Regions:
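N-terminal, active-site-proximal structural segment of metallo-dependent hydrolase catalytic domains
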Residues: 1-71, 76-90, 168-173, 193, ...
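Flexible glycine/proline-enriched surface loops and loop-helix/loop-strand junctions
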Residues: 127, 176-180, 263-265
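Metal-dependent phosphoester-hydrolase catalytic domains
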Residues: 58, 99-103, 117, 122-124, ...
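Short, solvent-exposed loop/turn elements at domain surfaces
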Residues: 4-9, 156-159, 290-291
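Soluble or luminal CAZymes and related metallo-dependent hydrolases
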Residues: 30-37, 123-125, 183-194
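Metal-dependent phosphoester/phosphodiester hydrolase catalytic core
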Residues: 136-148, 152-193, 197
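Structured beta-strand-rich core segments of catalytic domains in phosphoester-bond hydrolases
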Residues: 49-51, 55-157
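Catalytic metal-binding/acid-base residues of hydrolase active sites
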Residues: 2, 55-56, 153, 220-223
């Protein structure tokens, strides 16, 4: 049995370290409160694999994990070892044996798109973290398991600005806001299409990997049934093409075998009073209980979001945390 969870750390950085233009660095007191709070949430999750979003400093991530009191054999945030530049990175804490960790930054040439007024968009804004792990559970010792940690481009309008962060267009003009939102949509769509290729390369039984189990964790910045999420998962294609099952991803919430534990409505973020499930866990066919290729199942999915209704200090995450329990078969 393994627990998996995505965790938005909400700009986890060392004290005194500037991250976004116009936002003050954390002082020592605020940083300490952030470590204590995040460590406490990790302790509650007690997940075997945690995929982190918004990590500026690997040292801060390791400090937060240490505050949890839990033991992980690997804690890493590739690209943030000495501090991320320009945009936060993704991180991983795992108790499973790590075979390799890599970051996926660039799109294939055919996956690049032109974004109005910005030019060619050719790489993930936050490079994807890909890890190949080994579990001592499962049909055989050392069962391979891939994990993708993602953080797609947000729906926030992409306004034009200069290098100093000064606005270059009227943000009060509705037409300009619509065009800025289009830029964000194109960027997120391009990331989704590029990520789809990665998913297929891992899961296809006709591919180079021979089809290996995959768990995708992260902030999709849209709902599970949105166009961009389905570009990555292609779950809906299974309804009319059974041959698509091996390269589809399945929302853990939908394939959980203990549906009685579900709440009426799951959400991990509240924006302007509107709840959304942005933080998601997707699994390959190997974790769908009814599949003849199943090596396990999703037993249950839980959401930890009570803090979203508490005070809004920035040392808390503005996202809820989701945890899925994956049960691997033995023998």
């Amino acid at each position: 049995m393994h627990n998996f969870a995505p965790a938005t750390a909400s700009n986890l950085a060392l004290p005194g370290r500037a991250f976004y233009h116009g936002q003050d660095p954390y002082d020592a007191t605020e940083h300490e409160r952030k470590l204590v709070w995040l460590g406490g949430m990790l302790s509650r999750l007690n997940a075997d694999v945690v995929g982190f979003q918004e990590v500026w400093d690997e040292a801060a991530l390791k400090a937060a994990v240490a505050r949890s009191g839990l033991r992980y054999s690997t804690v890493a945030a590739p690209g943030a070892e000495t501090g991320a530049i320009g945009t936060p990175r993704l991180g991983l804490a795992t108790r499973l044996a790590v075979e390799h960790i890599e970051t996926l930054a660039n799109f294939a040439t055919a996956e690049r798109v032109v974004v109005p007024e910005l030019g060619e968009y050719s790489r993930f804004e936050r490079p994807v973290l890909h890890a190949r792990l080994r579990s001592q559970h499962g049909p055989q010792p050392g069962t391979a398991l891939h994990v993708l940690v993602v953080h797609l481009k947000s729906k926030r309008p992409k306004y034009l600005q200069d290098a100093a962060g000064n606005a270059l267009e009227d943000r009060d003009d509705p037409a300009i806001t619509a065009r800025a939102t289009l830029r964000s949509l194109l960027m997120r769509g391009a990331e989704a299409a590029a990520l789809r290729r990665v998913v297929v390369n891992i899961t296809s039984r006709r591919g180079a990997q021979g089809g290996e189990p995959l768990v995708l964790l992260g902030d999709m910045n849209d709902g599970p049934h949105s166009v961009t999420s389905q570009m990555i998962a292609a779950t809906q294609a299974v309804a009319y093409d059974r041959g698509a099952r091996d390269v589809a991803l399945y929302h853990a919430w939908d394939v959980a075998t203990e549906p009685a534990l579900k709440r009426d409505m799951a959400y991990s973020h509240v924006h302007q009073g509107w709840p959304e499930l942005l933080d998601q866990i997707w699994v390959s066919e190997e974790f769908v209980a009814t599949s003849r290729f199943a090596i396990g199942d999703v037993k249950r999915v839980e959401v930890f979001n009570d803090h979203l209704h508490e005070s809004r200090e920035r040392w808390r995450s503005d996202h809820g945390f989701v945890r899925a329990m994956l049960r691997l078969r033995t023998g």
